[in-house]
């Protein structure tokens, strides 16, 4: 419950979701949420966020990684007997926290992973900010005569399809196809 609140207190759009197949756990978390929210200075924000997202009952444990990858959470906390199995299937999450002694707040403030993470499902196509975002990269392309001859028809067809005749001609002229 505390970890759900830690996410929900950010704003009403914060995605704080508990997914479980254990109805007793869900009941216990709901009771704990009620108690903890009473003391929270940002109670209104957290309560609205939890109403927007909150708790999902999982009927098929095998679909958990599929659900995680669709949600693509900014923070994923795993508290199961099957953490290692689940992690192998997770492709879309900003940061992953494993076990009851690894709350997201530790990752935000002191454990070392970046706090700038993809939110609102954007972990499906991006990662957290890293040193790579501050590096300048470039591509070097060197094609041989044989290489351009092999690639020319594909490039020419694509260029024509995009109505970029200059692109097509820049390849044709190199292989003497006018």
Spans of features found by a protein language model:
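Short acidic-hydrophobic, aromatic-tinged amphipathic segments that line or gate anion-handling sites
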Residues: 55-61
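Short amphipathic alpha-helices in soluble, non-transmembrane regions
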Residues: 32, 67-70
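Short phosphate-engaging motifs
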Residues: 25, 63, 86
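A conserved active-site cap/scaffold subdomain adjacent to cofactor or substrate pockets
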Residues: 1-51, 55
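C-terminal core of ALDH-fold dehydrogenases
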Residues: 69-178
């Amino acid at each position: 419950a505390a970890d759900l609140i830690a996410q929900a207190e950010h704003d009403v759009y914060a995605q704080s979701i508990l997914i479980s197949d254990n109805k007793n756990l869900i009941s216990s978390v709901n009771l704990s949420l009620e108690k903890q929210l009473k003391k929270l200075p940002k109670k209104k924000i957290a309560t609205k966020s939890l109403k927007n997202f909150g708790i999902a009952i999982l009927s098929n444990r095998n679909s958990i990684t599929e659900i995680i990858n669709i949600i693509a959470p900014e923070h994923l906390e795993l508290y199961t007997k099957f953490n290692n199995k689940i992690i192998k299937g997770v492709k879309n999450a900003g940061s992953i926290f494993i076990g009851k002694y690894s709350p997201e707040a530790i990752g935000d403030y002191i454990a070392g992973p970046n706090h700038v993470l993809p939110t609102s499902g954007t972990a499906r196509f991006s990662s957290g900010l890293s040193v790579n975002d501050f590096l300048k990269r470039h591509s070097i392309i060197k094609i041989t005569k044989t290489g351009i001859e092999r690639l020319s028809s594909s490039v020419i067809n694509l260029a024509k399809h995009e109505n970029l005749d200059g692109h097509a001609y820049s390849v044709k002229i190199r292989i003497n196809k006018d």
